[in-house]
Amino acid sequence: MSEFWLCFNCCIAEQPQPKRRRRIDRSMIGEPTNFVHTAHVGSGDLFSGMNSVSSIQNQMQSKGGYEGNISSNVQMQLVDTKAG
């Protein structure tokens, strides 16, 4: 028994090729503009308690650049997800 292949190009729509994302290298990235370093904040700082968060907010506000912002009170519930 033999195989017989027949192509119907008129019935098959060509699938568009997915667009390839342009690869970015370091030479394409410029220096930051209007960058002001105000504080270092790590995950440990946020989990050490609300007093620490308030302290960080006060430190950042003392550096300036927050004059146009509206302040608000935020309440968060921390949930410990450590595996037991």
Curated annotation (Swiss-Prot):
One Gene Ontology MF term: small GTPase binding
Residues in CRIB domain copies: 29-42
Biological processes annotated in GO: regulation of cell shape; regulation of Rho protein signal transduction; regulation of signal transduction
Cellular component annotations (GO), alphabetically ordered: cytoplasm; cytoskeleton; plasma membrane
Keywords assigned: Cell membrane, Cell shape, Cytoplasm, Cytoskeleton, Lipoprotein, Membrane, Palmitate
Membrane topology per record: Lipid-anchor
Lipidation (S-palmitoyl cysteine): C10, C11
Keyword Lipoprotein listed: yes
Compartmental location: Cytoplasm, Cytoskeleton; Cell membrane
Classification via InterPro entries: CRIB_dom, CRIB_dom_sf, SPEC
Subcellular location, principal: cytoplasm
Highest taxon, organism lineage: Eukaryota
Family: Belongs to the CDC42SE/SPEC family.
Cited function: Probably involved in the organization of the actin cytoskeleton by acting downstream of CDC42, inducing actin filament assembly.
Protein name (record): CDC42 small effector protein 2-A
Species: Xenopus laevis
Gene for this chain: cdc42se2-a
